[in-house]
Amino acid sequence: MRHQSCRRVTLNYSMNKKKIEIEHTLNSTSRNIVWQLIGTAEGLNRWIADDVKMNGKHIEFAWGDDWRHHETRQATLTFCDRYERVRWQWDDEDDESFVEIRMERSSLSGQYTLHVTDFLSTDDLEWLQDTWSHNFERLRRTSGV
């Protein structure tokens, strides 16, 4: 099942990190639905993390549960253009890396594609690709897109 949801993966090198770009075509022609999935805490909660909270430009992501393995990360929303893209930087990173999710509508099919940009500081490219593949599969299961 590895990489089934990835249509294209591109690697670039920047800031001593590997920049990865992944495209994933959604089964949706609704910009409102797609925007809700990438531009709101409720939407990100459905596929990025187990719990997402937004307060202004502050975002908190949590994975796992309180009784077992639990990880949280804080981020700052650095760019948000409604119906286009969101970008955040992890607060515990001291470089200019970021996560960006951009939506684009196909002029042929009308379906939306998500373009994800992320950075990896280790050589574990497979781990990051698997993480995003899992996120896209979770998005499909929870939202049907």
Regions found by a protein language model. Give the residues of each.
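Generic structural detector for well-ordered beta-strands
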Residues: 23-27, 76, 102
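Short, charged helix-to-loop "capping" segments that act as catalytic/coupling loops
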Residues: 23-33, 66-70, 108-110
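Hydrophobic pocket/interface hotspot
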Residues: 33-35, 44, 59-61, 77, ...
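Beta-strand/loop substructures that line and gate deep hydrophobic ligand-binding cavities in soluble
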Residues: 87-141, 145
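Short, surface-exposed coil-to-beta transition loops
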Residues: 21, 70-74, 95-100
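Glycine-rich portal/gate segments that line the openings of hydrophobic small-molecule binding cavities
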Residues: 45-92
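Hydrophobic ligand-binding cavity/cleft-lining segments
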Residues: 3-53
